[in-house]
Amino acid sequence: MSVIKMTDLDLAGKRVFIRADLNVPVKDGKVTSDARIRASLPTIELALKQGAKVMVTSHLGRPTEGEYNEEFSLLPVVNYLKDKLSNPVRLVKDYLDGVDVAEGELVVLENVRFNKGEKKDDETLSKKYAALCDVFVMDAFGTAHRAQASTHGIGKFADVACAGPLLAAELDALGKALKEPARPMVAIVGGSKVSTKLTVLDSLSKIADQLIVGGGIANTFIAAQGHDVGKSLYEADLVDEAKRLLTTCNIPVPSDVRVATEFSETAPATLKSVNDVKADEQILDIGDASAQELAEILKNAKTILWNGPVGVFEFPNFRKGTEIVANAIADSEAFSIAGGGDTLAAIDLFGIADKISYISTGGGAFLEFVEGKALPAVAMLEERAKK
């Protein structure tokens, strides 16, 4: 990968626009999982230390584009950064026609999705972003798969476009896991978004020695084996695809599950065989026997790629499956890479961050890289490096 790296540049006195991934969960105005901000801090601190005039921005949530909405403001992120940095930090809401930044100051530019044209990679908006800076730093691996104005368009028009340390490290670590993995390689794909991940399973089936499915994805595989999944989240139209994958690769399907009659934090969990799920029940976690089977597989792995929980771990009664799997990954001697928002939240919850070899900040980008797709933001940086 040939891109200009931020670490190769002298940023003193330069106006530096960092596109970070600060899309973190917020509750009651407070950041509830800071993994992505923590990952971005070294990049911000490096630019400040060099005496740059630093601007940082991100998207947060899914507001209606072009409209300000306090619920999706970056203010909670700004308050978090004020606690962590000794430098002055301020939030600027209207910045498209220019913003004054002092050396050693951090200006957080409000949620890019409040700007009309952001998601469509609008050229006029991209040029306005580019006019704010001398150096554009793309450091948001989590959005590198989207061609948007703040991740892609700006890079075409900025004087200099480079990869931040976090983005560069992500690409190196993922390259190591996917190009020449130590074997056996085990890939875990969980979470609720089944349709978006079946193509990933297909790609991974060609690289991994063992695939593991969890969450809503596992329910589709349970249905593919002819079991009733009741009111569980699954995708009936993808059952045939799941059947095909079951014939072409080794995928352990849960033999026991935890169910409830409602999707709620207080719903009691019932542990039962996968054969006994009733019409009014929904599967919210894998059972103990299934979790132990997966733990055994993970114990013997040499490379582990982890994307997504195996149950609704946010609810204490349906946490055990993900906890057993997470601890098995933490205890394994394998080179482990974990990615995706829910996965990061699980790592935080179980306190195992220091036992994972590499934690990727990307969700969709992580999966698209795994699929072997070109990431638009990375392709743009490679193109700019040739000039």
Swiss-Prot record:
Which cysteines in this chain are paired by disulphide bridges?
none
Q: Does the keyword Acetylation apply?
A: yes
Q: Name one GO cellular component term.
A: cytosol
Q: Name one Pfam family in it.
A: PGK
Q: Which pathway, metabolic or otherwise, does it act in?
A: Carbohydrate degradation; glycolysis; pyruvate from D-glyceraldehyde 3-phosphate: step 2/5
Q: Which UniProt key words apply to this protein? A: Acetylation, ATP-binding, Cytoplasm, Glycolysis, Kinase, Nucleotide-binding, Transferase
Q: Where does substrate bind?
A: 21-23, 36, 59-62, 113, 146
For this protein, what is the EC number?
A: 2.7.2.3
Oligomeric and partner information = Monomer.
Q: Indicate what this protein is called per its UniProt record.
A: Phosphoglycerate kinase
What species does this protein belong to? Answer: Shigella dysenteriae serotype 1 (strain Sd197)
Q: Which gene encodes it?
A: pgk
